[in-house]
Design a protein with these regions (language model features):
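C-terminal "cap" of GNAT-fold acetyltransferases
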Residues: 50, 58, 114-162
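Conserved glycine-rich acetyl-CoA-binding loop
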Residues: 66, 88-102, 111, 122-129, ...
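Short, solvent-exposed loop/turn segments at secondary-structure boundaries
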Residues: 37-39, 95, 150
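Glycine-centered loop/turn positions within well-structured domains
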Residues: 80, 94, 156
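Acetyl-CoA-dependent GNAT
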Residues: 3-6, 11, 15-90, 101-103, ...
Length: 162
């Protein structure tokens, strides 16, 4: 558990539990509403969150017991991968996302990872500058084939050494 004061709040980061699956799915879907211009439907559901938890896990950020952020984390050998970074729309622009990335990187360092990988949808033009400012660099692209897409998209792969 890690605490950090941000915008006069105390943020607590913890490993998610299976009982958090519904709240995580709801938060991710809220945060990913900004992608409705290119994808139809919800980003995830509680069943998928539970499946991801069984494979790896999520970190949760809370303020006074309220779930305000989460991120999927997975150790892949000497590399870490994170995705579904989500912050409650009412709590964005307060540094919670940046803090959650910092805590995610600390999680991977503790697991012995030498680098972190992410992938972002190229249509989200706000994301590359955010991650570049945190030290991530583009390493390639990957197809994004999904029936829920309403327009063509691909992933931009980014990496950061730890």
């Amino acid at each position: 558990m890690t605490r950090m004061p941000a915008a006069a709040h105390d943020i607590r980061v913890r490993k998610a539990e299976v009982t958090d699956a519904g709240a995580i799915a709801a938060l991710v879907n809220q945060a990913f509403l900004v992608e409705r211009f290119f994808v139809d439907g919800d980003r995830t559901d509680p069943d998928e969150v539970r499946e991801l938890m069984a494979r790896s896990g999520f970190l949760c950020a809370e303020i006074e017991g309220e779930l305000v952020g989460c991120v999927f984390v997975e150790v892949r050998g000497a590399r870490g991968y994170f995705g579904m970074l989500s912050v409650s729309p009412q709590r964005q622009k307060l540094g919670i996302g940046r803090f959650l990335v910092d805590q995610t990187e600390a999680f991977f360092r503790a697991a012995g990872c030498a680098a972190v990988d992410i992938k972002i949808v190229h249509l989200r033009r706000d994301l590359p500058p955010f991650y570049r400012a945190l030290g991530y660099r583009e390493t390639g692209t990957e197809p994004f084939d999904d029936d829920s897409l309403t327009q063509a998209a691909h992933f931009v792969l980014m990496s950061k050494p730890l």
